[in-house]
């Protein structure tokens, strides 16, 4: 019985019993078919070993060659899915796509050698030449772009969109990379998010990082729990963790320091090893290098601070000129904005203590209080 079927070629059917609606064109197609229905095979030995599988489409020499009982697969291209035996609902388009797949289900591979090594993994999507080419058992991965997730073997739940995105990842799971070479060097780092050209480019084992914007966190290798949003944000960070940089060039020079928060264009821009600083506002704390535990809130607040520690500046240009003075508190616009090296001053109010340069241990409370004091102390 071969009801409603079409067969063209030699050595093309096995022992038919109740197969219906099959179409075969080429030598060796349907060589073992018994009862499978609704299959289409075009090309030498395509669907050659199928027995009971139904609703398969194989176009190309040896496509779906080893399929026996699996159904609802589509293979287009030379040797595409040629080793699949019982895997269901897969789609493979391109030469050698999903070539090693045996029992994996619900995979999509489009492009030369995409998902080539996949054996038993399920729910993967690979679009692009060599996308997910070495994946064997990793599940629910998505790679769109040439070489996307190229070295991934067993890791699951990764998403890579863009040329060579996440291409070196081997076992790192739960990563999302969107953009050319985004997270390209990542190997075992997990649960990272990188969006933009070359974001998190050199990250290898760092985990739980978020990088959005051109070259943000470009140099990070092992740092964890960082957030970088904006072109060049945390660009030089290598091993530091728990930093947050939002804005173009924010914390751009940071390498190994931890627990910094910078929000605003070039906020905390030159900080290298200073830790536990908070800078909010354009140019806030922007030339700090090694100063620690400072708080700068407002445009240009603590703008010139370099190595000083434990200062608090709130307001436009508050403590603007401070370089090495420590343990100062300035609240209000222009507050203590001429202070350079003085320490342990407290000033609250608009323009208060504005002209002080080196005076220490002063307290000024109120509008323009002690505005003209320059060097007094105690």
Mark where each language-model region is.
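Glycine- and small/polar-enriched repetitive beta-structure motifs of secreted/surface proteins
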Residues: 1-378
